Swiss-Prot record:
Organism this protein belongs to: Mus musculus
Record's GO cellular component terms: external side of plasma membrane; T cell receptor complex
SMART domains per record: IG, IGv
InterPro entries documented for this protein: Ig-like_dom, Ig-like_dom_sf, Ig-like_fold, Ig_sub, Ig_V-set, TRG_var/const_region
Official protein name in the record: T-cell receptor gamma chain V region V108A
A biological-process GO annotation: adaptive immune response
Length: 135
């Protein structure tokens, strides 16, 4: 199974497809609940890759939120309440963004991203995004 996943990752990487996947197009949560948004990373070097998280509110620019390089290198935002956290699961090649104590102003589309090396240099590659709706 690991060999198949590695082979698929390499093929997708070679053709420039599917490096990142956010499987949920949208999620809906109530105010004061928590949400987890996942990003599957199809890269053979996941353990050495920093995963960056952004959000874009309606009619606004992208906002950089947080990154995670290793599972022990989380950078929580929001002080003691840990409003936003990011983590990595090496077994599933997945990064998870957790947003706690949701408020209406958290409503946005959330994106994971990684830096990829191409012949022309480094470029940031984004997943499709997951829209968070807070009711």
């Amino acid at each position: 199974m690991l060999l198949l996943r590695w082979f698929t990752s390499c093929c997708l990487w070679v053709f420039g497809l599917g490096q990142l996947e956010q499987t949920e197009l949208s999620v809906t949560r109530e105010t004061d609940e928590n949400v987890q948004i996942s990003c599957i990373v199809y890269l053979p070097y996941f353990s050495n890759t920093a995963i960056h998280w952004y959000r874009q509110k309606t009619n606004q620019q992208f906002e950089y939120l947080i990154y995670v390089a290793t599972n022990y290198n989380q950078r929580p935002l929001g002080g003691k309440h840990k409003k936003i956290e990011a983590s990595k699961d090496f077994k599933s090649s997945t990064s998870t963004l957790e947003i706690n104590y949701l408020k209406k102003e958290d409503e946005a589309t959330y994106y994971c991203a990684v830096w990829m090396r191409w012949s022309s240099g480094f470029h940031k590659v984004f997943a499709e995004g997951t829209k968070l709706i807070v009711i």
